[in-house]
């Protein structure tokens, strides 16, 4: 009877120790999974930052023959395809602005075109000539 009781107690101790080890291993596995998930999120963030930086580098690259960035050339090509002439003053000012994206370049050109259109519609008052 005592032998059976001892075997039962030893069996319970072994089961308790094994379950404790399993819980410890499960906790370590959970911690490692959390760490891997954090690393994956960091990789995704770094990849996004890298793609944004590559886009900025591409937009800032300057064509030495015309001294304009790739985005400026692309927008001017759009105007050329649409048979819209851009005054050289606007182009010179645009090059000096060093705009970063195609949308910025497009907005700048359209703003300048509107300004120059209004400026060129002004007329001299008749009373000013005597």
From Swiss-Prot:
GO terms for molecular function: DNA binding. It comes from the Viruses. Belongs to the phi29likevirus gp16.7 family. The record marks 120 as: Involved in oligomerization and DNA binding. Homodimer; homooligomer. Interacts with DNA; one dsDNA binding subunit is constituted by three p16.7 dimers. It comes from Bacillus phage phi15 (Bacteriophage phi-15). Keywords: Coiled coil, DNA replication, DNA-binding, Early protein, Host cell membrane, Host membrane, Membrane, Transmembrane, Transmembrane helix, Viral DNA replication. This is DNA replication protein 16.7.
């Amino acid at each position: 009877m005592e032998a059976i009781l001892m075997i039962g107690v030893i069996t319970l101790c072994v089961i308790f120790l094994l379950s404790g080890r399993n819980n410890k291993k499960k906790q370590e596995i959970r911690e490692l999974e959390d760490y891997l998930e954090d690393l994956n999120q960091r990789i995704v963030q770094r990849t996004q930052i890298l793609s944004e930086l590559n886009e900025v580098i591409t937009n800032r690259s300057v064509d030495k023959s015309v001294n304009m960035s790739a985005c400026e050339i692309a927008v001017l090509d759009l105007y050329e395809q649409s048979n819209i002439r851009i005054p050289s003053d606007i182009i010179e000012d645009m090059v000096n602005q060093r705009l970063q994206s195609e949308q910025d370049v497009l907005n700048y050109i359209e703003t300048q075109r509107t300004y120059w259109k209004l400026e060129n519609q002004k007329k001299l008052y008749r009373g000013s000539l005597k």
